Regions:
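Glycine-rich phosphate-binding/catalytic subdomain of phosphoryl-transfer
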Residues: 1-178
Length: 178
């Protein structure tokens, strides 16, 4: 995404990197000691490893930092491509490794630790909120009416657990694997 929030179709920065890419794991393990790991967990509610977007970005893109305009998960990129809005939800934000669960925003200290400018990260909104209407390009691509609401959405594991158990009390759902 460039500075005008337009898709850069002719100059990708590289191939998409998904959560299964573990090349940054050993590097992140060396960079984060036990005390830091406990502090990251306290602040984010998530264990930290090289598959989270913040360490992955630092590991893979540190030489090309000046070229990067936005950092998005695959879901967030799809939402952007369909609506033009750069937005994520809290469950996906947790996968960035810098989302503070107490104040529900990007944690500036964790962003600084990984060398991330918070301005590169998407806005955070609730998952069941419309991100916007389907844009003309998305309408043509999908054969759907322009303007239909596109929701912010949530992480697949969160949606799967919700679909299995709903919001009912006394219900257990187990998600294993991917």
């Amino acid at each position: 995404i460039d500075e005008r929030r337009a898709l850069v179709r002719d100059a990708p920065l590289g191939r998409a990197i998904d959560w299964t890419d573990s090349r940054a794991d050993a590097w992140a393990a060396r960079r984060v000691d036990g005390k830091q790991r406990a502090e990251f967990y306290r602040r984010t509610g998530m264990p930290i490893d090289g598959r989270y977007l913040a360490p992955m970005f630092e590991y893979h893109w540190r030489q090309r930092r000046s070229d990067v305009r936005r950092i998005l998960s695959a879901k967030d990129f799809l939402c952007f491509a369909l609506t033009g809005r750069v937005v994520t939800d809290p469950s996906t934000a947790a996968g960035y490794g810098v989302y503070g669960i107490t104040d529900r925003r990007w944690d500036p200290e964790l962003c600084a630790y990984w060398g991330l400018d918070p301005a590169l990260l998407p806005e955070i909104a609730v998952a069941d909120m419309p991100a916007g209407g389907l844009n003309p390009a998305g309408s043509r691509l999908l054969g759907l009416p322009e303007g239909i609401p596109i929701m912010v959405g949530a992480a697949d594991s969160v949606c799967g657990a919700l679909a299995m158990a709903g919001l009912a009390e006394d219900t257990v759902s187990i998600v294993m694997g991917s």
